[in-house]
């Protein structure tokens, strides 16, 4: 008997199914991709018991010719490619010809399809055709998959609960809807509609369906292009983050992919705007020449190889930075959720079945503007239509405050409110560039060397002028302008100022140094000594020059004049620890970490009471920062309470 044997098709398909058909969500993904490749404009997906019992997919695509239906369930039979050249210019989602035979080998399948002239129906069990007959000529395909893994019980026992499997299917459908907003998707689980999109091509509307209306409202459009790539999509403002990367969706030529470097590029675009351990929400759609991407890496087609990956990552990061720089990123306080009424649900035009007249609500005043002569604030703004229904996963986020009816009557602002705030601070404005008294410099200087204020300082995205009126608990500055009240975290504010100051100094060639009367002596461990010896050039690039002074001992005889005073030794030690944690850290990354660390040490601390002119100087310097809205660790610097919200809190408007 021969030792090496040719496996039969049934066994080969089961082996292939181990990679292609992981769980019910894998089947939904493959079959929906087939429907998309068939130029469908409407796709219905119905599952029962998380897809374990039944999966039904109906589309209105081109269908399959009756005489080719049986061939479609053969291994490596496909209409997508014909030659080797086609393999490197793939423009479809499917191309391997493995999905249908793999699915059929581990389940019972019933498919009915037609190109519009004649229809055919076929039934399979365990990959074998058991029945075949003509059917109606409705153009499109209906496929029903039941009893998944009925003939491979070992695979069945490794599946999770019904709710978990249904969640995976929902994730697949959400990605498909985001990738193809021009297709009308209808996803039903156990008889309940989970997702239903309009298919009108409005990506923001689909985001509202998937992530919720409030999330969609905080999404910022993004565009970018180069000779090889075209980028468009939406990113959430930094105030809206998640605990993992699952909310970053990257699509290349309509295909959802996972790529660590591109995900990292998204995070780099939010540089210092995200809190540690938090991740942004992003929906990015990339278009490129198919020759620049290799999708033939894994049967699941989630992993791809990219040409010019570094250039693409840089373009993504820069496009995100540009989009965020054009937005006002001052977060507003979170509103309490209250019970919503049916009329309030309908007042926001999320429905595409029901399109009510656009209501006028108050203008969200985030940009500086002059008040009218009669001192009234126009708070009307057309609400944006961005979706219709919501899934159970985010239904709780859809709460709307009671009392906000359409066309609410908003009285003029009380005359006692000071309107010309700038007059009060004319003298303080003239003192902006003056230094603080010496005793304050010793304690924790509030004022930094003035950062250059760009020509676009008053453009969209720039921080508006703020006028301090007091301080709370020696920690928060209370300020105002025509748009309302602001709370500023004074430590975070100066941390941002110091960070940009140190970051600028670290990037410059080493300038003046300060000789120390008493050199700093560092006693290190053997491991630390080895790391310092290997990374001496990196330390010198950030202004730290170490001389050997015996076994495992180094001395520092000078340091740059801009080093944080009084914290020189601890600063140098922390730089050594960073090298110890990451020996491969680049000079740029070390400069970045050093700037963050030094800014935190040098910034003014809480419980530090400031005079009004000191607060004014701090706020003016903050305005000159390139990124004034977050500290280097991503925490917010400023919280905005609009005049409308304050009046609403005091029941002056309803």
From Swiss-Prot:
Biased composition (Polar residues): 384-394
GO CC aspect terms: mismatch repair complex
Keyword list, A-Z: DNA damage, DNA repair
UniProt key word DNA-binding: no
GO biological process, alphabetically ordered: mismatch repair
Top-level taxon: Bacteria
One Gene Ontology MF term: mismatched DNA binding
A Pfam family the protein falls into: MutL_C
SMART domains: DNA_mis_repair, MutL_C
Residue ranges the record marks as coiled coil: none
InterPro entries in the record: DNA_mismatch_repair_CS (IPR014762), DNA_mismatch_repair_MutL (IPR020667), DNA_mismatch_S5_2-like (IPR013507), HATPase_C_sf (IPR036890), MutL/Mlh/PMS (IPR002099), MutL/Mlh/Pms-like (IPR038973), MutL_C (IPR014790), MutL_C_dimsub (IPR042120)
Sequence segments annotated as region (Disordered): 358-437
Residue ranges with Basic and acidic residues bias: 413-434
Family, as annotated: Belongs to the DNA mismatch repair MutL/HexB family.
Function, as annotated: This protein is involved in the repair of mismatches in DNA. It is required for dam-dependent methyl-directed DNA mismatch repair. May act as a 'molecular matchmaker', a protein that promotes the formation of a stable complex between two or more DNA-binding proteins in an ATP-dependent manner without itself being part of a final effector complex.
HAMAP family associated with the record: DNA_mis_repair
Name the record gives this protein: DNA mismatch repair protein MutL
Species per Swiss-Prot/TrEMBL record: Shouchella clausii (strain KSM-K16) (Alkalihalobacillus clausii)
């Amino acid at each position: 008997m021969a030792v090496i044997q040719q496996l039969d098709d049934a066994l080969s398909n089961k082996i292939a199914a181990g990679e292609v058909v992981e769980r019910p969500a894998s089947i939904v993904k493959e079959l929906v991709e087939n429907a998309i490749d068939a130029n469908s404009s409407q796709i219905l997906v119905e599952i029962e018991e998380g897809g374990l019992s039944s999966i039904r997919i109906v589309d209105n695509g081109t269908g399959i010719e009756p005489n080719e239906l049986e061939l479609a369930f053969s291994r490596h039979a496909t209409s997508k490619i014909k030659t080797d050249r086609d393999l490197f210019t793939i423009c479809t989602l499917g191309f391997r010809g493995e999905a249908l035979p793999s699915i059929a080998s581990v389940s019972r399948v019933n498919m009915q399809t037609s190109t519009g002239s004649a229809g055919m129906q076929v039934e399979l069990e365990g990959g074998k055709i058991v029945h075949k007959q003509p059917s109606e000529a409705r153009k499109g395909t209906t496929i029903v998959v039941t009893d998944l893994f009925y003939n491979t019980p070992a695979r069945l026992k490794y599946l999770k609960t019904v709710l978990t499997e249904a969640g995976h299917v929902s994730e697949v459908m959400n990605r498909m809807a985001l990738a193809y907003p021009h297709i009308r998707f209808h996803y039903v689980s156990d008889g309940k509609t989970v997702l239903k999109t309009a298919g009108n091509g409005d990506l923001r509307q689909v985001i509202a369906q998937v992530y919720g209306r409030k999330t969609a409202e905080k999404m910022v459009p993004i565009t970018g292009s180069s000779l090889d790539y075209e980028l468009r999509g939406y990113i959430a403002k930094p105030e809206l983050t998640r605990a993992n990367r699952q909310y970053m969706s990257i699509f290349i030529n309509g295909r959802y992919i996972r790529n660590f470097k591109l995900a990292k590029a998204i995070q780099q675009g939010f540089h210092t705007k995200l809190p540690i351990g938090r991740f942004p929400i992003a929906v990015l759609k990339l278009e490129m020449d198919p020759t620049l991407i290799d999708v033939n890496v894994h049967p699941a087609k989630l992993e791809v190889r990219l040409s010019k990956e570094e250039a693409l990552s840089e373009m993504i990061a820069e496009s995100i930075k540009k989009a965020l720089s054009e937005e006002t990123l001052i977060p507003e306080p979170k509103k309490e959720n209250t019970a919503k009424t049916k009329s309030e649900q309908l007042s926001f035009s999320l429905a595409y079945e029901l399109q009510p007249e656009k209501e006028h609500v108050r203008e969200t005043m985030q940009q500086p503007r002059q008040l009218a002569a009669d001192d009234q604030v126009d708070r009307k703004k057309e609400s944006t239509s961005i979706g219709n229904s919501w899934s159970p996963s985010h239904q709780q986020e859809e709460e709307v405050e009671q009392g906000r009816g359409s066309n609410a009557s908003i009285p003029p602002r009380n005359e006692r409110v000071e309107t010309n705030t700038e007059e009060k601070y004319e003298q303080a404005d003239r003192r902006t560039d003056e230094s603080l008294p010496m005793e304050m410099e010793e304690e924790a200087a509030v004022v930094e060397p003035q950062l250059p204020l760009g020509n676009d300082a008053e453009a969209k995205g720039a921080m508006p002028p703020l006028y301090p009126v007091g301080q709370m608990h020696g920690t928060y500055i209370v300020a105002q302008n025509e748009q309302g009240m602001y709370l500023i975290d004074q430590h975070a504010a100066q941390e941002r100022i110091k960070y940009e100051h140190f970051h600028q100094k670290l990037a410059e060639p080493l300038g003046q140094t300060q000789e120390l009367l008493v050199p700093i002596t560092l006693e290190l461990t053997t491991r630390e000594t080895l790391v310092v010896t290997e990374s001496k050039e990196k330390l010198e690039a950030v202004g730290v020059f170490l001389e050997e002074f015996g076994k495992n001992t180094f001395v520092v005889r000078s340091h740059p004049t801009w080093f944080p005073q009084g914290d020189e030794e601890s600063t140098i030690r922390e730089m050594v620890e960073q090298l110890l944690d990451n020996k491969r850290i680049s000079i740029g990354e070390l400069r970045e970490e050093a700037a963050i660390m030094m800014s935190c040490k040098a910034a003014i601390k809480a419980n530090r009471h400031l005079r009004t002119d000191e607060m004014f100087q701090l706020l003016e310097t903050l305005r000159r920062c390139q990124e004034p809205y977050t500290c280097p660790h991503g925490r917010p610097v400023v919280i905005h309470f609009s005049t409308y919200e304050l009046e609403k809190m005091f029941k002056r408007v309803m």
